[in-house]
Each structure stands twice: as C-alpha cells, then as structure tokens.
C-alpha cells in the first residue's frame, strides 16, 4: 500500500523534474540578455537579499547565515575545483577548518583582532591548498579523490590530537569582528548574514572575471580534455594548482566567518560528512554553473531547517499521513532521511542539476543520460558570455576586421625564425619496456616544406609526433625546434617554442563552441597572469579582444567562420578536422604537425583539405604530415620519410619514394607476379 502511494507522489514529481523547461528557457534567455538587463536583474536580486532578512524572526536570520550563507560560500569555492576545473575533491572541509583554526589561534593566542586575522586565514588556507595540490595534482580521477579525502581527515585528526589547537576540547573565546559603521558584531545573526552576503558578492565579481578570461577557458579545456589542453599551450598543472588555491582561499573565508560568529570551534565541527554536503550542493545545483551552485547550496542549507520547523513539519506530516495512510507523529526526526531521498530522486531524473552549465548539459546529452533538457544547450558557459550563443551566426568577418584595424584575414600567426631548419630529430630512439617503437630515427625539416611521414600501422609515426611534442621523452637522441633543443620540456612549453599539432583521433573540446576552441589556442601566446585577470588590467582586456578577433579570422580562413557559435561536438566531421587545424594554428607555431588529417573524409572533403594544406604552406607555415592516403601525400608533400618497425627506411622526394623497392615491399606493395603458378 505504501509503495503504491509513494508512486502516486513521485510519478508527477519525476515529470516535473524532467520538464523544468521554464528554468532552462530562462537560463538561455539570461545568456543572451544585454548587460544592462543583467545588471538590473542582479541589482533587484541583491536588493531582495538585503531587505527580506529584515522581516524575518531571529531564528531564520540565523539560518540564512549558517548554514545557508556559509554553504553558498563554500559551494562556490568547491565549484571552482570540481565544476570548472573537473578535479574531484572529497576533503574540502579541510580548508574550511584551516581558516577557522587560523582565526581562532590568531585572536586567542596572539591577540589579533578578527578583521586583522581575515587576510591571514584566507592566505593560510590558500597555502594549504597549494601544499596539497603541488604533489598530488598529477593524479587524476579516483586517485586524486582518495588523496583529498585523506587530507581532510588528517587535518581533523591533527586538530583533535594537538594540545595547542585545543585538542578535542576545541578553542573558546574567539574574538568577534570589531564594530564598523556603528554595527556591532556579537552573537546577533543579522550583521553576520550581511557580512556573508558581502563576501558572496565580492567573490562572485572576482569569479566571473576569472571565468571570462584565459583562466576560465583553461579550466574548461582541462575538464574537457587535459592532454589536448596541454598540447594547445595550456599550463595544465599550474592552472589546476590555481583552481585548488582559489577554492581553498574561499574555504578559508568561510572558516573565518564561522569562527568569528560562534566564538568556539572544535574538531567535531569539521567532519568528512561536511565535505559531502558541500559536494552535494555543487552537484544538485549544476556543476560549473554559478547560479546553479548558489541554488543548490540554498536548497541544501534551507530545506532541512525548514523541515525542522514545527509548522512546516506538521504540514509535511499531514501530507505523508494522507498519502500513505500511516500515522507519522514527529516528522523532524526523519528530515535528513526525507531530504536525502529527495536528492536521490533529483539526481535520477535531472542529473544535470537545477541550473546546469552548458558543458554539463551537453556532456549528459551526449551520453544519453540527459532526459530533462531540450536539444539546445541550456546556458552559456560563464567563461565565454561574449562568444556567439550555440547555433547563432557569428560576428561578420568585416566587423571583426574593422575592430582589428583592418588586418588581413589571410595572415597567419606564424612564428618567424632565422633558422633554415625548423625541426630536426637526431637519432631518436623510443623504447617501452624493451619494445623499440622508434630506432635511431633522424629527420630534418626545412622551413616552408610540407614534409610527409608514411609507413604501415605500428611503424612509429604517431610515437614520433609524441616525442616531438613532449608527450613522451625519447630514450635517447634529441629533438630541436628552430635550432634549440626541446628535449625534456613539458608539452605546453614545446607549444610555446613553436610546435603545434592535431591528433589522429579528433580531440577538440566538444562542449565549447568553435570560437572558444580557437581562443584557447590564441591564449598560448598571451601572458596574462591570474592576478591580471582578477584585477581586469588593460593588457588583459586588450588580449581578450584580440584573441576573439583572431579566432574568428582563423575560422574564416579554414572555411567555417559561420559556425563559430556552434558547439564543436555538433559540427560535421570535416568541419571538426578544420576546426582542429585552426586551433593548432592559433598557437602561433613555426611548424604544424598534422596526424592523419584526411582520415574518414570523403573525396570532396579530401580535395578541399589538399587546398587548405597548400594555402597554409603558402602563408609561411612549415607542415609535417602523417597520412595513409597516397594520392594526398604525393600531391602535396615536398619530401617524404618512410618508417617501418620503428626505423627510417627511406627519405627523399615523392617520386623517388614511389619508385624505391624497399618502400614498395614494406608499404606501397609490390606488383602482383603474373608469372607465378
């Protein structure tokens, strides 16, 4: 009986969660709204947040500070790590604890005022994030999650067993902030609520600056495909470390607020379950979505407290008794269970969250899991609000050219060097556990050439590219770019040295637009720092404008300028290949490595690709090409090298290679012996 009664409740609830179309349409309209409309809406929302608490009783004012306000601050910080950079952190409560304990020690032991301890609490938490991230961020997925979980428990256990930190007794007598503008900070919740609100507003301002900059694009690229991001010049380790540091600093801010308000902390305030709650807020709201995370944190903090309220509990009790025919007397003791059950239902029927980011919605749609969204992506990623919305026409080439002072669309960002030899491999050998993938390979590529590398599958062609780009470090030998050795450099450093590549299997950032993909490439040539992005320095704003203009030019150059606002995953296969080439060119290379660019193309697409490759070469860019299509190779290459079983068996002009008996036997195929019996 109870089972069938619950079905009566949850069937309509499931339909509601699947069809949150007004929320999704509103998110799309918000993404396309002009700046002044967004400003008015945010101003009205801020006024609402300021005025409404004045009408509430003290209990609900206290709830708005903790848990709601603290949860929102912490969820915004964790969203940087989990939602934007794609790093799973299960020990986030540690940074909250570090901020709280720093405040407690400075105000009780060293006599600091609460305001004076604020920057130190944030800084120490940030340092803790760096100390955790530096040795662990080369781990990925579950391994990183396990390490962060352990860190969270270590911080709590250290606090519990350290006498100077109060051990299990905790620390009492933490100072409240001194009065400002006549406002006293004692135990009354309202001043602390407004303090938390101010922290949220300032944090949102800084966060939006980051997400609309190179930093935000780098985080999005890392989440989409970390290896491809590194190949496009993104310093992935540094950017992940910045994400950890920013998230930790936000957690430290939350710890300062909490300790300053309650005046007493102990290790029991920072259990592992608290990290789970904040992570649940991020997932519930929509990973990567700032408004979604705020909504999720509000729900996580407010609803259990609402269920605790006697009047609300009586209402829900009456509803449950009516539906199930049971006799529930005290609903408050089941509030966590009911809320947990509601979260499970939410995650089943709307896994993208309340207000999902565009990336999250697209990922779930691609996996066939997204039952709650229309085909059109819901919201534009905050990192590129200025980019065309998906499916919308891009800015015209003429308008962009005018913005860039009339620079020519055909100009490529080619790195100009005096050296005649662009790329040189000197006796490169690559072994994997005794298996020789490359054996003493030497190749010299002259400036302005289209140099082809051919050979049967397994000959070592892609391994050679991986050695050049820093994915693998050769067992022996050397790799020189423009006369300088790049051996041992990380892939993004080799990109900076002038090497760009495409991949055998297309590796775009599928849930970013075509324009955003190429802008990630242009970022490799810009030097804007994270502090510069936070402060919105003139250089940063100029580079942002120039990067978008140049990205649109390159899309026009490869023939897909009209698709700039489309998600990369929605482009036809041939256009995806062109986009990958445009993104690689955007890094400003002196040599472009193309790994089987014609694979999967039809004859007309291949013919267009031949024209594009020649056009790129004529613009001054050297090309090294791996390809199995002999018609394409013989038609565009100036010189060829042939690999077989990891060794170079021939090198020379295409005609000589075509007639080389050893190449014919190993790869091209010998003519059939008609005289055989």
Regions of interest found by a model, annotated:
Residues 1-394:
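Transmembrane alpha-helices and adjacent helix-loop boundaries
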Residues 1-3, 61, 162, 168, ...:
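Generic N-terminal initiation segments characterized by hydrophobic and/or small/turn-forming residues
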Residues 17, 21, 28-30, 38-40, ...:
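Short linear motifs at secondary-structure transitions and domain/linker junctions
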Residues 32, 50, 139, 268, ...:
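Residue-level detector of alpha-helix boundaries and kinks
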Residues 172-175, 184, 342, 355, ...:
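Compositionally biased, intrinsically disordered low-complexity regions
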Residues 359-429, 672-677:
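ABC-family P-loop ATPase nucleotide-binding domain
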Residues 414-677:
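Glycine-rich phosphate-binding loops of nucleotide-dependent enzymes
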């Amino acid at each position: 009986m109870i089972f069938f009664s619950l079905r009566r409740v949850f069937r309509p609830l499931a339909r509601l969660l699947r069809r949150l179309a007004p929320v999704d349409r509103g998110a799309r309209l918000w993404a396309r709204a002009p700046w002044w409309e967004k400003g008015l809406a945010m101003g009205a929302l801020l006024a609402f947040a300021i005025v409404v608490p004045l009408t509430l009783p003290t209990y609900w004012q206290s709830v708005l500070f903790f848990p709601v306000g603290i949860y929102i601050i912490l969820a915004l910080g964790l969203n940087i790590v989990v939602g934007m950079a794609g790093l799973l952190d299960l020990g986030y409560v540690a940074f909250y604890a570090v901020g709280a304990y720093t405040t407690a020690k400075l105000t009780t032991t060293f006599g600091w005022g609460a305001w004076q301890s604020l920057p130190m609490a944030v800084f120490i938490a940030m340092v803790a994030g760096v100390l955790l991230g530096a040795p662990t961020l080369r781990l990925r997925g579950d391994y990183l999650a396990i390490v962060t979980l352990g860190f969270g428990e270590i911080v709590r256990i250290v606090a519990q067993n350290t006498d100077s930190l109060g051990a299990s007794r905790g620390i009492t007598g933490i100072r409240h902030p001194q009065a400002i503008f006549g406002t006293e900070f004692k135990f009354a919740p309202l001043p602390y609520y407004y303090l938390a609100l101010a922290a949220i507003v300032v944090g949102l301002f800084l966060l939006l600056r980051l997400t609309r900059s190179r930093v935000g694009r780098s985080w999005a690229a890392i989440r989409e495909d970390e290896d491809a991001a590194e190949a496009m010049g993104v310093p992935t380790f540094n950017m992940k470390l910045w994400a950890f540091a920013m998230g930790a600093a936000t957690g430290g801010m939350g710890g300062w607020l909490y300790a300053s308000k309650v005046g007493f902390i102990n290790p029991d305030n920072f259990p592992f379950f608290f990290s789970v709650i904040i992570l649940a807020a991020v997932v519930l709201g929509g990973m990567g979505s700032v408004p979604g995370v705020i909504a999720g944190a509000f729900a996580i903090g407010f609803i259990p407290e609402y269920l605790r309220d006697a009047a609300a509990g009586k209402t829900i009790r009456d509803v449950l008794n009516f539906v199930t025919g049971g006799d529930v007397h005290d609903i408050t003791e089941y509030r966590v269970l009911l809320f947990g059950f509601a979260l499970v239902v939410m995650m089943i029927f709307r896994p993208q969250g309340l207000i999902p980011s565009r990336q999250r919605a697209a990922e779930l749609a691609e996996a066939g899991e997204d039952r709650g969204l229309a085909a059109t992506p819901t919201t534009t990623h905050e990192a590129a609000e200025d980019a065309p919305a998906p499916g919308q026409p891009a800015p015209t080439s003429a308008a962009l050219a005018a913005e860039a002072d009339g620079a020519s669309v055909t100009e490529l960002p080619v790195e100009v060097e005096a050296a005649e030899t662009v790329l040189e491999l000197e006796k490169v050998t690559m072994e994997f556990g005794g298996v020789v993938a490359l054996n003493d390979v030497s190749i010299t590529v002259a400036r302005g050439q289209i140099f082809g590398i051919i050979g049967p599958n397994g000959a070592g062609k892609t391994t050679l590219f991986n050695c050049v780009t820093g994915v693998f470090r050769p067992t022996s030998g050397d790799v020189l770019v423009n006369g300088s050795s790049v051996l041992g450099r990380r892939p993004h450093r080799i990109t900076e040295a002038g090497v760009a590549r495409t991949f055998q299997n297309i590796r775009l950032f599928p849930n970013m637009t075509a324009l955003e993909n190429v802008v990630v490439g242009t970022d490799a040539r810009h030097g804007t720092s994270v502090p510069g992005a936070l402060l919105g320095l003139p250089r940063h704003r100029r580079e942002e404008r120039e990067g978008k203009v140049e990205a649109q030019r390159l899309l026009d150059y490869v023939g897909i300028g009209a698709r700039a606002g489309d998600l990369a995953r929605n482009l036809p296969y041939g256009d995806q290949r062109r986009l990958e080439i445009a993104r690689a060119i955007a890094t400003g290379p002196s040599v472009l490595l193309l790994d089987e660019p014609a694979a999967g193309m039809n004859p007309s697409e291949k013919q267009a690709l031949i024209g594009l490759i020649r056009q790129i070469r004529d613009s001054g860019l050297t090309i090294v090409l791996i390809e199995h299509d002999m018609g394409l190779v013989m038609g565009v290459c100036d010189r060829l090298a042939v690999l077989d079983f990891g060794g170079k068996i021939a090198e020379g002009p295409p005609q000589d290679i075509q007639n080389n008996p050893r190449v014919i036997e190993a790869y091209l195929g010998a003519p059939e012996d008609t005289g055989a019996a």
